[in-house]
């Protein structure tokens, strides 16, 4: 169905270079004609809403620190009220697409814009404003010294041209996008499930190697670690504090511009998405290191996330290949000589579930690895030469799995990119979806993606 989409039959000039030609029966109005500021406060009884690039506007969980690290003040009386259907914009991150329609009555940060939005179909309006061409234009309408401090202004956004198809066309576009997003999301979920299965296979291989070694015939002994059981007799068991040096970090003042945009990589949890840290999103200056609580750690250090909502599921660890600074949610480890850092990272990945239970404080409102638990953890330590042998053996056994995971992750990236381009083409009138929308049934259809999960699971064996 998607492949059969064609342009509209007639177009006209939009009056905007970045929008180009638009369907001849669509209107173009400046955003100022469609929005009116909505000012209401002092409703702390309403649910707290937040805005994110990926989600749009959503009800914020007060217990899940992984959603947002911003501190919630005790007094919410000054928070703005957003009524269901209002347009909410995070003015400091509009250039990233952090905007959307409020799904229910709630309250938002005083730093957000809240507007009444006079458009026939608010779901269409949301899809339009969050599309790639419009997000880029909101960036142009923002002021600031550097990207991270861009601030959307009312003056800048008032003249943004808004495309207005007839109400029936808006409804058709929304219906088609809901269907196509559902189909693409189904394919993405199928690939994610296969990645999960592959990661489980990989973890089994790692766990066996770091807890029993490579030779199944060696005699065993009790480890003295309740969750671990027996280990090879010639391995030692030592507390981590006797084998590692630990270093924490901090955040230089965001208000001091002389601390930021320097040459020193500053690692925070958002950088910990790979096993090797070569660079970071944020950089700081030497002055920031000298005048704040952050610390420099040498190249070759093992970096670990110790405070983040992601610790509900996994323990991100990575090795730095350059000197870096850390924020307060990170910790670095350097070896005293008997425990190879690459091997210890492998041990963490192989025993992640058990270590999460050992290292995190049960009942804490913010997921964090307690240093006392971490430093006093008993770990089995093979001779240093055997550690390298285990690393080499595991790398060889898991290489085909790693390759398969990378392939599926790349396919997910391509599907997301395709979805982004499809939405942009549909909401800006490059593709006519009216006929396609008429053919859609009200119930969820599976069509060409219905067998994805089965096909992908069968593909696992072929990938290994």
Which residues are covered by each model-predicted region?
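A short glycine-rich beta-alpha junction/loop motif
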Residues: 10-14, 91-92, 106-111, 146-171, ...
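Short, conserved charged micro-motifs
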Residues: 120-125, 338-343, 388
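Sequence-specific dsDNA recognition surfaces
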Residues: 14-15, 29-84, 241-256, 270-299, ...
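Non-catalytic DNA-recognition/assembly elements of restriction-modification systems
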Residues: 9-44, 159, 167, 171, ...
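Amphipathic alpha-helical coiled-coil/heptad-repeat segments
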Residues: 1-19, 25, 165-218, 378-464
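Short, ligand-facing micro-motifs at secondary-structure edges
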Residues: 47, 53-68, 87-111, 127, ...
């Amino acid at each position: 169905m998607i492949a059969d989409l064609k342009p509209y039959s007639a177009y006209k000039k939009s009056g905007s270079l970045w929008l180009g030609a638009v369907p001849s029966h669509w209107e173009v109005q400046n955003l100022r004609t469609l929005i009116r500021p909505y000012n209401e406060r002092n409703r702390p009884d309403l649910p707290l809403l937040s805005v994110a690039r990926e989600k749009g506007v959503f009800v914020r969980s007060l217990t899940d620190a992984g959603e947002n690290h911003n501190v919630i003040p005790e007094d919410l009386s000054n928070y703005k009220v957003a009524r269901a259907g209002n347009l909410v914009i995070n003015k400091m991150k509009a250039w990233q697409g952090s905007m959307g329609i409020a799904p229910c009555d709630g309250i938002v940060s005083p730093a957000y814009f809240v507007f009444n939005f006079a458009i026939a179909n608010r779901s269409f309006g949301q899809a339009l404003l969050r599309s790639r061409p419009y997000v880029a234009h909101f960036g142009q309408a923002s002021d600031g010294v550097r990207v991270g401090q861009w601030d959307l202004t009312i003056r800048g956004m008032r003249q943004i041209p808004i495309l207005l198809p007839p109400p029936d066309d808006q409804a058709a576009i929304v219906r088609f996008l809901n269907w196509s997003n559902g189909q693409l999301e189904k394919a993405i979920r199928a690939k994610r499930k296969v990645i999960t299965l592959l990661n489980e296979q990989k973890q089994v291989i790692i766990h066996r190697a770091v807890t029993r070694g490579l030779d199944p015939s060696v005699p065993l002994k009790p480890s003295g670690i309740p969750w671990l059981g027996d280990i090879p007799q010639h391995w030692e068991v030592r507390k981590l504090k006797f084998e590692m040096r630990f270093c924490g970090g901090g955040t230089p003042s965001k208000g001091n511009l002389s601390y930021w945009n320097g040459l020193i990589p500053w690692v925070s949890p958002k950088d910990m998405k790979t096993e090797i840290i070569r660079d970071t999103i944020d950089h700081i200056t030497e002055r920031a290191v000298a005048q704040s609580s952050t610390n420099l750690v040498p190249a070759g250090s093992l970096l670990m996330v110790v405070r983040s909502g992601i610790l509900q599921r996994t323990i991100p660890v990575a090795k730095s290949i350059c000197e870096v600074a850390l924020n307060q949610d990170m910790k670095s480890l350097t070896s005293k000589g008997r425990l190879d850092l690459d091997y210890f990272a492998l041990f963490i990945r192989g025993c992640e579930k058990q270590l999460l239970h050992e290292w995190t404080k049960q009942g804490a409102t913010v997921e964090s690895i307690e240093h006392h638990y971490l430093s006093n953890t008993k770990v089995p330590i093979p001779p240093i030469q055997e550690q390298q042998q285990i690393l080499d053996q595991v790398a060889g056994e898991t290489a085909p799995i790693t390759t398969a995971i990378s392939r599926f992750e790349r396919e997910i990236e391509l599907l997301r990119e395709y979805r982004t381009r499809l939405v942009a083409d549909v909401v800006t009138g490059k593709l006519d979806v009216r006929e396609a929308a008429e053919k859609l049934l009200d119930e969820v259809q599976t069509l060409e993606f219905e067998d994805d999960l089965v096909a992908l699971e069968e593909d696992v064996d072929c990938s290994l």
